[in-house]
């Protein structure tokens, strides 16, 4: 089954890891994740009609080199998690090709912000399962009951190729994208304006996200308990929901600098 919004068009022949790397623990030996590849019926065996259609996930399988079904289930029982095995690679001039830029880039900058000299009581929540209903955000917001929440994430750039200008949500290399609204939340107007003022006054590259689409952890956080002022700071990412995302390192730095400027103001 698909956990999240992975694009089924890009799955066939992708290398994956099955299970987790587990270190030595309580006297038990270390365990390494299995290598695998996503397979499907060979194209020369498909009908002409089938070749024109995207194969549904139900028609795909993961090949771990097992000789039969029993061996496969012994090594990877039903429910074993599968992740893409995409290495992080610098490309172009200051860009990075990696998996899960949306939203691990936000986790990276949260780790950096842990060292900032913040001027207010600050909690750092590394939430899980955003792609399947922001489940981690609900628990974190219920526990913390924040007054203000900045959501650090990655978002679709859609700026490559011959796209209509109205469909270019944000652009790589133009700075952190600040959202005024999406399908999950509406940014608190004063907070949105303050972040833009901080960015302009500090010379931090920034842009306003130009599409009211998608959703993220801002929705549950804004509506949990007594509610919170929220605003989303996003790093533009190309090809989200795929094994390979592309982001600009200058945009990553801009997200960090703007969040830091707000927390240390």
Q: Whereabouts are the PLM-identified features?
A:
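N-terminal hydrophobic/helix-forming segments and targeting peptides
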Residues: 1-265
């Amino acid at each position: 089954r698909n956990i999240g919004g992975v694009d089924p068009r890009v799955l066939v022949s992708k290398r994956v890891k099955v299970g987790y790397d587990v270190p030595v623990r309580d006297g038990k030996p270390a365990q390494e994740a299995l290598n695998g590849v996503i397979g499907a019926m060979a194209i020369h065996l498909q009908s002409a009609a089938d070749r024109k259609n995207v194969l549904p996930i139900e028609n795909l399988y993961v090949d771990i080199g097992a000789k039969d079904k029993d061996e496969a289930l012994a090594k990877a029982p039903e429910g074993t998690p599968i992740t893409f095995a995409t290495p992080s690679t610098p490309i172009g001039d200051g860009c990075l090709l990696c998996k899960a830029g949306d939203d691990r880039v936000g986790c990276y900058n949260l780790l950096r912000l842990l060292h900032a000299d913040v001027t207010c009581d600050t909690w750092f929540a590394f939430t899980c399962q955003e792609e399947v209903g922001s489940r981690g955000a609900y628990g974190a917001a219920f526990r913390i009951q924040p007054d203000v929440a900045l959501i650090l994430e990655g978002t679709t750039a859609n700026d490559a190729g011959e796209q209509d200008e109205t469909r270019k949500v944000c652009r790589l290399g133009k700075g952190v994208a600040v959202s005024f609204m999406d399908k999950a939340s509406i940014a608190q107007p004063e907070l949105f304006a303050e972040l833009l003022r901080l960015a302009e006054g500090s010379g931090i590259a920034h842009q306003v996200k130009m599409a009211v689409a998608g959703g993220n952890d801002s929705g549950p956080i804004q509506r949990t308990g007594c509610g919170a002022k929220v605003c989303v700071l996003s790093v533009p990412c190309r090809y989200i929901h795929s094994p390979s995302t592309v982001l600009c390192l200058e945009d990553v730095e801009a997200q960090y600098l703007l969040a830091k400027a707000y927390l240390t103001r």
